[in-house]
Amino acid sequence: TLGAEQKQWLLDGLYDSRSTWRLIGNPYNANPLKIEDLDTPELRAMNPNLRHNEGIYVSNEGWDDYQVERKEILDFLVEHDIRNVVFSSGHTHVFFASELQPDFDDPASPVAAFDFVTGSLTADPPAEDIAPLEVLRIAQQLLLAQNAPYLKDVNLIDQGYALLDCTPEETIVTFRVIDTFDIDAQPRTYAQFRVARDSRHIERMV
């Protein structure tokens, strides 16, 4: 949670920075994780008093618990045309790649920033001890479907880490996975993304 003083410090830093890339280290995912969208034109026609962005969200201590503050930050970035903002997030123990919009239910809402969330290396048991792999694969597809088009990738199964490489012209994020229960296992790249300087979109490279 950001208090008023902390939030203003963050906004001032983003506004005053002359760096090409503005990186925000973040303990939890900034992207929404909606299980069911309840703010649809059909539902709103039946209930005009429906709250904006109404839905059932995954409760994981992420920014979905602080939607007003998230929107304020993203609106600020759009209002002042502050680009090249990348949230680098962890602690969720899964991989996500997302484009962040002030209003995720409005297709015309501009992309204000990007969120890349890394999996964990040592914090979790084998995925199949949590749920059958087929169930996890279905969950991945459901999350992608419910959070399209801004959620670009989700991996609930593999353990691993992320590499973030910034140059003056682009940021490359590489998701690496490894079987941490196999002593002979080697890491492999399962996904790689590019954000070009001043771009509003993520490009998938792998």
State each model region's role.
Residues 1-206:
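Long, structured stretches of catalytic cores involved in phosphate-ester chemistry, encompassing
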